[in-house]
């Protein structure tokens, strides 16, 4: 792999998206939001009436979708077939649906090469859960972000409320813990850090502090 790739992995709510968008803007790199691809695919399946347990039909659907990401400051706009679906894919339900389809090998296979195709001569920030272990195992720089379930719940509640969604702390905390258990124990590509990833715990750090630590680490591998 000749193109410079930086992977940012970790569970939901740790700040992967914000860090990835910030790094893409500061470094002038392209951006891949892997989690959004799964959410977009689940949304498309829902709209077309495809069941979330129909592995074959889900795998057939994915290659037909036109997906792109537009990074603006610390925000990422997700586009599906020319439509801005950012708001639709950020709901709690969309996240649950994405985890449901992510367990299927054929679905992951259908998306794997597509994600690798995001690699760019300008450089790439790849945000996801298995970017450093499966999608870009040879990436030059790898991060794995962590944060407590309680802190992630606080962030998620605030995010949902700011977007106009109802949010219950207890329900979201339970959902996060359930997703964590499912993602870490699933048979196909469980959520684990790459062996050569730098672990960043953002529980008690501001996003500015996380970005600063990430940039300092990246500078060890690439001069800008």
From Swiss-Prot:
GO terms for molecular function: ATP binding; CMP kinase activity; dCMP kinase activity. It is found in: Cytoplasm. It catalyses: CMP + ATP = CDP + ADP; dCMP + ATP = dCDP + ADP. Transmembrane segments: none annotated. Keywords: ATP-binding, Cytoplasm, Kinase, Nucleotide-binding, Transferase. It is an enzyme of class 2 (transferase). Its main location: cytoplasm. It comes from the Bacteria. GO terms for biological process: pyrimidine nucleotide metabolic process. ATP binds at residues 10-18. Its EC number is 2.7.4.25. One of its GO terms (cellular component) is cytoplasm. Belongs to the cytidylate kinase family. Type 1 subfamily. NCBIfam families: cmk. This is Cytidylate kinase. The gene is cmk.
């Amino acid at each position: 792999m000749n193109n410079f790739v930086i992977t940012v992995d970790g569970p939901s709510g740790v700040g992967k998206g914000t860090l990835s968008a910030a790094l893409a803007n500061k470094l002038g790199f392209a951006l891949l939001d892997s989690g959004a691809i799964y959410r977009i695919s689940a949304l498309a399946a829902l709209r077309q009436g495809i069941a979330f347990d129909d592995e074959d039909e889900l795998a057939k659907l994915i290659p037909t979708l036109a997906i792109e990401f537009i990074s603006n400051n610390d925000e990422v706009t997700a586009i599906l077939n020319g439509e801005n679906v950012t708001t639709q894919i950020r709901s709690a339900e969309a996240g649950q649906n994405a985890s449901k389809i992510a367990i299927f090998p054929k679905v992951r296979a259908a998306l794997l090469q597509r994600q690798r195709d995001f690699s760019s001569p300008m450089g790439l920030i790849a945000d996801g859960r298995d970017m450093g272990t499966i999608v870009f195992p040879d990436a030059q720089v790898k991060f794995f972000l962590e944060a407590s379930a309680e802190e992630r719940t606080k962030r998620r509640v605030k995010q949902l409320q700011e977007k106009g969604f109802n949010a219950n702390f207890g329900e979201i905390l339970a959902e996060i813990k359930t997703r964590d258990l499912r993602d870490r124990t699933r048979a196909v590509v469980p959520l684990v850090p790459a062996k050569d990833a730098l672990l960043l715990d953002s529980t008690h750090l501001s996003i500015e502090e996380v970005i600063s630590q990430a940039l300092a680490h990246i500078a060890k591998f690439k001069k800008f």
